[in-house]
From Swiss-Prot:
Heme binds at residue 452. It comes from the Eukaryota. It is a single-pass membrane protein. Its EC number is 1.-.-.-. One of its GO terms (cellular component) is membrane. PANTHER family: CYTOCHROME P450, CYTOCHROME P450 MONOOXYGENASE AUSG-RELATED. Belongs to the cytochrome P450 family. This is Cytochrome P450 monooxygenase nodR. Disulfide bonds: none annotated. Keywords: Glycoprotein, Heme, Iron, Membrane, Metal-binding, Monooxygenase, Oxidoreductase, Transmembrane, Transmembrane helix. InterPro entries: Cyt_P450, Cyt_P450_E_grp-IV, Cyt_P450_sf. It comes from Hypoxylon pulicicidum. SUPFAM superfamilies: Cytochrome P450 (SSF48264). It is found in: Membrane.
Amino acid sequence: MFDIDFGILFPISWEQSPIFLAVGLIFAFATLSPWLRSGERLINGREGFEILWTNAKKRYQTKGRSVMEAGFSKYNDSFYMMTDSGTEMVLHPRYVDEIRNDPRLDFHRYMKTKGGEINRDLIQTKLTRSVGRLIGSISAEIEDALHNRWEEGEGEYEEYLLVLPPAEMHTEWHEIVLLSVMIPVVAQGVSKMFVGDPLCRNKDWIGMILRHTRSVQTALRSLRLWPYFLRPLAARFLPTCRQVTAEIEEARRIINPVLEKKRAEKLAMIQKGEKPPEPNTYMDWLEESDKDEFYDPVVAQLKISMAAIHATSDLLSQTIFSLCDSPELVKELRAEAVSVIGAYGWGKEAIYNLKLMDSVLKETQRLKPMQINLTRLALDRIKLSDGTVIPRGSKVLISCHNMWDSNVYPNANQYDGHRFYKLRQRAGMENSAQLSTPSPDHLGFGLGMYACPGRHIASTVMKVTLCHILLKYDFELAEGCTPRVIEYGSFLLADPTARVSIRRRKEEIQL
């Protein structure tokens, strides 16, 4: 899922900023430390008469993939790169097996998150195991959201729909800005698992988490251009960061009454000698978890919602863009959905047996992963098998460019929706070629001890959503529209402006 540096936004304290250091010493450290650490192996330094690293960071933000490609063309194994997070050591993907489970390379410390281990455990041991019994409920939310957003033009994103009377929107072709209309659909679907009823259909909650996702991304873009030691101070005054803080308080006003009601009902049942209902949502399991000083149920909900909604909507939208160029593949996917859902209904068996759909999603993610590297912080000095040294305290990026290597995947630059479906037919690859199974050759969901804990949930939500879209809508790219891949630093994002024409069709089976 989407990696977000929450540590500089939630929470912010004056103690984080070394305000008592002399200004001259700070300035010297900020300007010289990247060069001192990386030496000649810094691939993208300052240019001309630049003193600070701000412009180098901006160049990385707009050309991150090109900078990384230039680094590997000059240095085969490792080099340093100035990113918007500072100087980072970049490693070739051949090292991924060495670092995947090394506890000295820490993802949470890189992201500066607190309580991440608790959230990961809850997602893996509680939420993922409950998905099977929630699939029918998730489907109902997706169905409701698609009807309201794609057909009725309801809600915050109605400006992204071609204006038509609601009746005609059921039968006539009309345009949508796909990503912008996909986001609230996914938000309602995942909220069923995260907060449950009634919040999953609460327009204030859905609208708030959508706005908050945009606000956090905007705040981080501006904040990362500041020297690290000044970020806590800048976050106090930048309007974008103040907006994030205001939205957290708005989230508290929405969630806290629901939490208080749940707590009161549970206490009343216990006092009567009755057994409270079993936890059924992420919110419930957070309440049941061992809480520490970092426990904040509202911030926890915002974090998981942002990560899940953004990444899932992005991959779904990119998949639809790819399918617009493959009408025969669309027919095959529809036939598979009719066959599988008709045979199994909504359950784990259905999700597992949507094998072509699984392959299509995995191939889309292979060609356009949301992030082109894995991230870690070195807690100690580490010497790799070939003698390469990772200095203690280094931020480390492991490149994912092997996913586009024709030595790994034949015709790697071509989209082949059947690629992983065929691989699953090979002996011993039934599981390894699945979307939710990371491997050294496919790092879309990370790898090892820090692989995305919500990947099984994301896979389920995407398959349910695609089934509804495929069976209920005809779709094609809007006239004159060619979706782009938006590059931002290490991220590859689906085109947020690309338009798709859709029309309601009669589904072959009831979902």
